[in-house]
Amino acid sequence: QPHIIQLNTCCPLSAVPHISRKTIVELWFVAELELAQSKLIEIRPKIGAFVSYVNTDIVEQLRDLRCVLEAQLAVEACGMLTKSQLDSLYENIALWEMYIKRGDEEKIFTLDKEFHGSLYKMCGKTVWYNLVESMAPHFDRTTILSFRCKETGRILKDHGELVAAIENKDKEKAAHISQRHMSRYSENIDAIRKHFPDYFND
């Protein structure tokens, strides 16, 4: 089981004027409940809170959902995105290339989230986006782990090809690339399990 989480009330925050230990504890419990609702931690009464294993069932279901939603997004984007919006996506890809060379997985992950989030928002699908994000934490964990054990260039290539297809208004190709992109999880999961077995219990 992943490590138990402990609250350190001697942290620098507790030394800030006007922030009491009681306030810190209350904030911690709120955060703990939110993490538990996202199934990122497991609360065991009288024992403590433990980081949860990766829930592959949630990951698979979210992948299936995103596969459908983002293929439709790609189709709609072909008839909606402006040159300025396309340029913004291309700029994201250019930053990806820079951070791949630097090996900065945190920046790469942030840019990946921004790329997909931008497509939802550019197409006016904020409800879809909020739904996906509400289920995202376990999927995000596997994404980060995949960056640590798999070459990220294929993901970047998918992004570039997707934007090019949208720019060319090729709806069929855009949908195909989007679905292929979401299938990367299935390609990566065996490698993720092999390199990080302690994150799984199924």
Q: Could you describe each region identified by the protein language model?
A:
Residues 1-79, 190-202:
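Short linear motifs at protein or domain termini
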Residues 62, 79-144, 155-164, 173-184:
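Conserved amphipathic alpha-helical segments that form helical-bundle/coiled-coil interaction surfaces
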Residues 138, 143, 168-169, 197-202:
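Charge-rich, acidic-biased intrinsically disordered regions
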Residues 151-153:
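Active-site loop of classical SDR/Rossmann-like NAD(P)-dependent oxidoreductases
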Residues 172-202:
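C-terminal effector-binding regulatory domain of bacterial HTH transcription factors
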